[in-house]
Amino acid sequence: MEPDFWHSKWNAEQIGFHLNEVNPLLIKYWPALDLAPNSQVFVPLCGKSLDLCYLAELGHKVVGCELNQTAVEQFFAENSLPHLMTPAKESISELNRFDASDITLYQGDLFSLTPEELSGVDAFYDRAALIAWPESMRLAYVEKLIELLPPKSMGLLVTLDYPQEALKGPPFAVSNDWVMANMADYFELELLSSEDVLNENPRFVNKQVPWLTESVYQLKRRG
């Protein structure tokens, strides 16, 4: 999606994708990665997710990237986190940087993020990034993720799948076949769960979407 689309959603407070709790799937499946507490975790398209705080509470150093500055500012304000903001013009980065004790957020275009800015990353968590891209842009995101993540890094990926013609995304439908066809060359993939969650999502029910499958994958970057 174009940046203006996401900025307009935040400006209008149309953020149905935001959860007001830690994602239960993160709580359930993150321990399977068996990471050291001080591991550094990358969270792309993080919004103001409470998952960032949860990961930090586990002892991880969390690095997120979010396009919209309002989302970043709300995250720190709503969680009462003192932070330091470094504008892009005052650093070598093309993104604004917000630093709290265990959480760093880069604000700006994900595609401007560099591997150097993620040096030290051991893991990643994608709940709402892959499904935020229409199919025409999705592969470019995967290629960027591959560029940013070092070999052997572990990750958790959450996807949604449904008949795309039944509803205009985002979130967009991402099938298991798409994940395997486009990511298996770069990641070892293990499907941890796949469940129908239609009844838990009124928007999809109201649009008469016939089914909605939420899947969780464990990934390991090849190399």
Swiss-Prot record:
InterPro entries named in the record: SAM-dependent_MTases_sf, Thiopur_S-MeTfrase_Se/Te_detox, Thiopurine_S-MeTrfase, TPMT
Main localization of the protein described in the UniProt heading: cytoplasm
A single cellular component GO annotation: cytoplasm
Enzyme superclass (EC): transferase
Positions that bind S-adenosyl-L-methionine: W10, L45, E66, R127
Enzyme Commission number: 2.1.1.67
Gene3D superfamilies, sorted: Vaccinia Virus protein VP39 (3.40.50.150)
Catalytic activities: S-adenosyl-L-methionine + a thiopurine = S-adenosyl-L-homocysteine + a thiopurine S-methylether
GO molecular function, one term: thiopurine S-methyltransferase activity
One GO-annotated biological process of the protein: methylation
Compartment(s) where it occurs, according to its Swiss-Prot or TrEMBL record: Cytoplasm
Family classification: Belongs to the class I-like SAM-binding methyltransferase superfamily. TPMT family.
The name this protein goes by in its record: Thiopurine S-methyltransferase
Organism: Shewanella woodyi (strain ATCC 51908 / MS32)
Gene responsible for this protein: tpm
